Amino acid sequence: MGYAREKNGKVIGDVSEEEINVLASNLNSSDLLVSAIGGNMHQVVSLVQHPIAFDFFMHDESQYSDTSFRQIIPYSQILDFFISNLRSKDCERLLQLKQCAKCKVCHLIPPPPKENHEHILKKPESTFRNNGIMERGISNPNLRLKAWKVQVKALEAICKEMGVELIKPPTDTVKKSGFLKEEFYANDATHANAQYGLLVLNQLTDMLK
């Protein structure tokens, strides 16, 4: 089930926000409500090469993503940007669910980015085509991975305030480098496939035991 919204002139999703909140309020205390709201903010921020190339330091990082000149943005500024945007968009809906539900509420951390540029350019989603991915190219993979890590940090801060548990990507789906393994790529620039989804369902099943 997904929130109904318009995209590229078509309605996607099948349930209104009000209907989803009612369904959440009807759950029993022994149920489990799992949110996969949003998730692509890190891709919107970092996938398409920005006209002004930028980078930032993670706290445990001693080098930039590459050696070319880049506009350096303070980590705290990047983190605040993610927290502010998530809080006012995706996490606003998540908070509504938390307030409506009597049961435990969890939120799925989105899968990490794909490292393979060739795969990404085969079938990028309309958002990225409209933002010029075919003309401007793709950002450095390490920058994209760092943007995902910042989104995770932002979600950790927000969900802790809400009392929502975060569910990490299944361990077997992630490379040692931190990127999504290629066998779990969906046929687009950003999403994971059904095999990945099955492993997530296994995680949720284990939580209910």
Residue ranges with predicted function:
Residues 183-209:
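Histidine-centered active-site loop/cap adjacent to the catalytic His
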Residues 85-92, 172-176, 180-182, 197:
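Catalytic phosphate/metal-binding cores of nucleic-acid and nucleotide-processing enzymes, i.e., regions
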Residues 16-33, 89-105, 156-157:
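Short amphipathic alpha-helices and their capping/turn segments at secondary-structure boundaries
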Residues 117-168:
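Substrate-gating cap/lid alpha-helix
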Residues 13-86:
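A basic- and aromatic-enriched beta-loop-alpha substructure that forms the phosphate/nucleotide-
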Residues 41-46, 113-121, 174-178:
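Short catalytic/ligand-binding loop motif for oxyanion handling, primarily in non-cytosolic enzymes
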Residues 109-111, 161-182:
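Acidic carboxylate-rich catalytic motifs and surrounding loops in phosphoryl-/glycosyl-chemistry enzymes
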Residues 1-15:
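A short beta-strand-loop structural module common to alpha/beta enzyme folds
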